[in-house]
Curated annotation (Swiss-Prot):
GO terms for cellular component: cytoplasm; nucleus. It catalyses: ITP + H2O = IMP + diphosphate + H(+); dITP + H2O = dIMP + diphosphate + H(+); XTP + H2O = XMP + diphosphate + H(+). Pyrophosphatase that hydrolyzes non-canonical purine nucleotides such as inosine triphosphate (ITP), deoxyinosine triphosphate (dITP) or xanthosine 5'-triphosphate (XTP) to their respective monophosphate derivatives. The enzyme does not distinguish between the deoxy- and ribose forms. Probably excludes non-canonical purines from RNA and DNA precursor pools, thus preventing their incorporation into RNA and DNA and avoiding chromosomal lesions. It comes from the Eukaryota. One of its GO terms (molecular function) is dITP diphosphatase activity. This is Inosine triphosphate pyrophosphatase. It comes from Scheffersomyces stipitis (strain ATCC 58785 / CBS 6054 / NBRC 10063 / NRRL Y-11545) (Yeast). Belongs to the HAM1 NTPase family.
Length: 194
């Protein structure tokens, strides 16, 4: 059985990834998928400016070099249609700079409040190896903040077909429709086929 290190320091993201990949969490935050055991490590990786794909590839290659083995990284973006998909991969910095209400206010004068949540996982077997990308997209709208505000921008993103934000949805429902679920579903298929 091979070990893959999922590089994240975000405890909420780790719990969600493990729940989606395996449906349960074992001791120490490990998850088994096919012939792989997923373990966690927090690394402070440089994030270059670029597309979500470029950011993810850079993070995966950097993590593989540092850890010397198979790694999994993730990058998430939120793109506003009215802003030609900005803030995109810079959403984390927008949330820190202007807050959730600031993001909502950015769309105040725009009729189009639609947005896309995009999650991209990058898998790299080790130093010098190519990076495989797995991307999931969920369409929705930006709304006034509703629900808990402890997980990024979940409280302002309402997926199409639902009357609740990600933050208000039951975890099992969110984990069956989210951009992260869609990307992980592709990743799981890849890992099981190896």
């Amino acid at each position: 059985m091979s070990t893959v290190t999922f590089v994240t320091g975000n405890a909420n993201k780790l719990k969600e990834v493990i729940a989606i990949l395996s449906g349960s969490q074992s001791e120490g935050g490990e998850s088994k998928v096919g012939n792989f055991t997923i373990v966690n490590k927090s690394l402070d990786l440089d994030e270059l400016q670029g597309s979500i794909e470029e950011v993810t590839i850079h993070k995966a290659k950097s993590a593989a070099e540092i850890l010397g083995g198979p790694v999994l990284v993730e990058d998430t973006c939120l793109g506003f249609t009215a802003f030609n998909d900005l803030p995109g991969p810079y959403i984390k910095w927008f949330v820190k700079s202007v807050g959730l209400q600031g993001l909502v206010d950015m769309l105040y004068k725009f009729e189009d409040k639609s947005a896309k949540a995009i999650c991209t996982f990058g898998y790299c077997e080790g130093p010098g190896k190519p990076v495989q990308l797995f991307q999931g997209i969920t369409k929705g709208s930006i709304v006034e903040s509703r629900g808990p505000t402890n997980f990024g921008w979940d409280s302002i993103f309402q997926p199409d077909g639902f009357d609740k934000t990600y933050a208000e949805l039951d975890k099992e429902i969110k984990n069956s429709i989210s951009h992260r679920f869609r990307a992980l579903d592709k990743l799981r298929d890849f890992l099981v086929s190896q």
